Amino acid sequence: MSDEQSTPASGRPPRQSRGGLTSTGARKAASKSNRSRAREFALQALYQHLVGGNDVEAIDRFTRDLSGFHKADSVHYDALLRGCINSQVDLDALIAPKLDRTMAEISPIEHASMWIGVYEFQHCPDVPWRVVLNECIELAKEFGGTDGHKYVNAVLNGLAPTLRAAEVEHDRAGKGSAPAQPAAKADTATDAVADAATDAAAADDAADQAAG
């Protein structure tokens, strides 16, 4: 983030950043579901919280004014934003044991992606665990560093057997998926899981249609 985009002393996010965080364009906009868009805006809002410590109401007002927000599932966005911020201590307590470094050493994008994943594992049982995993990998790919998504994958894939135990056990028994990889082996953990998650992604779109 440039000096011009840093958070002002007033605590309100900068007015000039109406385009939000810069995406790599890893996924075409037309292919994104309303919930996928909600996760993207939640990620941007949580980034503001992690970097600037801004008030949640100020962050929310700013984010809702970003271009394209009207295409997002605002209810899901709101649940992720407020749920993650309100539960951040508990979320970090689950994430920290899966890290091979301190929490301060992971990027805000990776941190926010993990928050979203853990929160959805816990509170969104209608979203298959593989969809949650794949969506958070995509968030890290679009907005994070080169290999950040591999780290997000390893941590969330390590937590899924605990937070979605029955679902993961049933899924892996049927498909013979590999066991979860520790964060230190993140470079080898992504491909097989992401491929399987793609098969389940249609469930998230179906949830959008049912909600509509």
Curated annotation (Swiss-Prot):
Protein name according to UniProt: Transcription antitermination protein NusB
Family the entry assigns: Belongs to the NusB family.
GO cellular component, one term: cytosol
InterPro entries for this protein: NusB-like_sf (IPR035926), NusB_fam (IPR011605), NusB_RsmB_TIM44 (IPR006027)
Function: Involved in transcription antitermination. Required for transcription of ribosomal RNA (rRNA) genes. Binds specifically to the boxA antiterminator sequence of the ribosomal RNA (rrn) operons.
SUPFAM superfamilies to which the protein is assigned, alphabetical: NusB-like
Organism: Delftia acidovorans (strain DSM 14801 / SPH-1)
Biased composition (Low complexity): 178-212
The encoding gene: nusB
UniProt keyword terms in alphabetical order: RNA-binding, Transcription, Transcription antitermination, Transcription regulation
Location of region: Disordered: 1-34, 169-212
Any Gene Ontology biological process: transcription antitermination
Entry superkingdom: Bacteria
Gene3D superfamilies: NusB-like
One of the record's GO molecular function terms: RNA binding
